[in-house]
């Protein structure tokens, strides 16, 4: 006869890596999500401090400057090769490109920086009815034009800054709809792989036609 099957322990033991936790044990585990694709609040603060120290930005305006920079990246693509035009709205003698250069000094990429502000940028565009500049060229339709920026995937990430108020429909529902129909052309975002039409167990076209994307992707 073989060895008898051991009886599971009545209580979870953290000292035993094979001990089976109960739901109450899992609830007691404190976990903070960390992703390398989104800048951390500490990294964002380090970048804005560089703006103050190296470019002379007033310390009480760095938040506005950061949101403006992320919004500008939404128009041109959040990459090292992006050409940023215009000036910082809180210090008109400083170019946006100069602000962007300090991002690299902090060892952060433009995509990571922008991803932190994805929810803010998205709601800003909805509130002002001002989608990314090249949405049509990027292959988006009018109903999904507000999703036409290359850090949109961070809109429903817990690592992105959450606006105090949202001008859009609930993020999770709207993001599910927007991501479902995103079909940017390969030349617009070459790093993206083909997106299969499925979302939360629902299949593509037949499910999508039952929803009003216009109401989900435009401001109230």
UniProtKB/Swiss-Prot annotation:
GO cellular component terms, A-Z: helical viral capsid; ribonucleoprotein complex
Pfam family, one: Flexi_CP
UniProt-recorded name of the protein: Coat protein
InterPro entries, A to Z: Pltvir_coat
Ribonucleoprotein among keywords: yes
Organism: Cymbidium mosaic virus (strain Singapore)
A single MF term (Gene Ontology): structural molecule activity
Keyword annotations of the record: Capsid protein, Helical capsid protein, Ribonucleoprotein, Virion
Disulphide connectivity of cysteines: none
Family statement: Belongs to the potexvirus capsid protein family.
Cellular location(s): Virion
Stated role: Required for genome encapsidation. Forms ribonucleoprotein complexes along with TGB1 helicase and viral RNA.
């Amino acid at each position: 006869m073989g060895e008898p099957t051991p009886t599971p322990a009545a209580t979870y033991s953290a000292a035993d890596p094979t001990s089976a936790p109960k739901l109450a044990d899992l609830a007691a585990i404190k976990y903070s999500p960390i992703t390398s694709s989104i800048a951390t609040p500490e990294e964002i603060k380090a970048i804005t401090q560089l703006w103050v120290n190296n470019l002379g930005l007033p310390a009480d305006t760095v938040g506005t400057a950061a949101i403006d920079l992320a919004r500008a990246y939404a128009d041109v693509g959040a990459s090292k090769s992006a050409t940023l035009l215009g000036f910082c709205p809180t210090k008109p003698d400083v170019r946006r490109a100069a602000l962007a250069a300090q991002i690299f000094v902090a060892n952060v990429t433009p995509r990571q920086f922008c991803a932190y502000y994805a929810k803010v940028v998205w709601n800003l565009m909805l509130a002002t009815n001002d989608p990314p500049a090249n949405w049509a060229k990027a292959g988006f339709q009018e109903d999904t034009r507000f999703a036409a920026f290359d850090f949109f995937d961070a809109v429903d990430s817990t690592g992105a800054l959450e606006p105090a108020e949202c001008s859009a429909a609930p993020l999770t529902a709207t993001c599910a709809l927007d991501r479902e129909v995103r079909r940017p052309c390969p030349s617009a975002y070459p790093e993206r792989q083909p997106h299969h039409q499925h979302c939360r167990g629902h299949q593509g076209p037949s499910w999508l036609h039952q929803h009003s994307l216009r109401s989900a992707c435009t401001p109230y």
